[in-house]
């Protein structure tokens, strides 16, 4: 009888370790993909000697990053609000984790922007660099704001406070849909 229980415990431990390793592997691969994207932009900016091409690459990089942040904001805001309305603590934790990943990614992107600004002509660098840093700060602020919205919702659900009534959910849902549609424009 003791041997069967020990074998069952070992099988359970093995299954747990396999699942845990798979989850950690996926996180690692996602992080490496984000780093690879940043590295490819850096290499393109370093390789170019033409100031106009550098400006074009810098604009493309800025546009892509800001669009990505707005799409991320739309998705995480929607997930955060619906996680709160549905009292889905797991979803709210996933949103918080995604926000932390995005914050670190935006820091890396800001460093790429610094490199990009150095590749531009001096007069253009002053003008475009200012807008780039301002855009990056706005993007960081959007992510920070969603975090500040998600934290109280997560705490509310985690502490098992009374849920929203249907009227509140309906009003909150309408407002959420308007904000998400605005971000997706």
Predicted regions: what they are:
Residues 1-185:
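Cytosolic, long alpha-helical scaffolding segments
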């Amino acid at each position: 009888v003791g041997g069967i229980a020990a074998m069952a415990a070992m099988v359970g431990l093995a299954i747990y370790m396999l699942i845990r390793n798979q989850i950690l592997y996926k996180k690692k691969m996602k992080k490496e993909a984000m780093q690879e994207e940043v590295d490819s932009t850096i290499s393109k900016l370093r390789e170019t000697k033409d100031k106009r091409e550098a400006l074009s690459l810098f604009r493309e990089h800025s546009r892509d990053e800001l669009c990505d942040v707005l799409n991320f904001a739309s998705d995480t805001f929607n997930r955060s609000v619906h996680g709160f309305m549905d009292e889905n603590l797991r979803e709210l934790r996933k949103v918080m984790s995604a926000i932390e990943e995005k914050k670190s990614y935006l820091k890396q992107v800001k460093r790429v922007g610094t490199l990009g600004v150095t590749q531009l002509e001096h007069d253009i660098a002053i003008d475009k660099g200012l807008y780039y840093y301002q855009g990056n700060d706005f993007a960081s602020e959007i992510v920070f704001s969603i975090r500040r919205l998600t934290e109280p919702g997560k705490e509310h659900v985690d502490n098992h406070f009374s849920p929203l009534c249907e009227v509140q959910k309906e009003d909150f849902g309408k407002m959420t849909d308007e904000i998400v549609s605005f971000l997706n424009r």
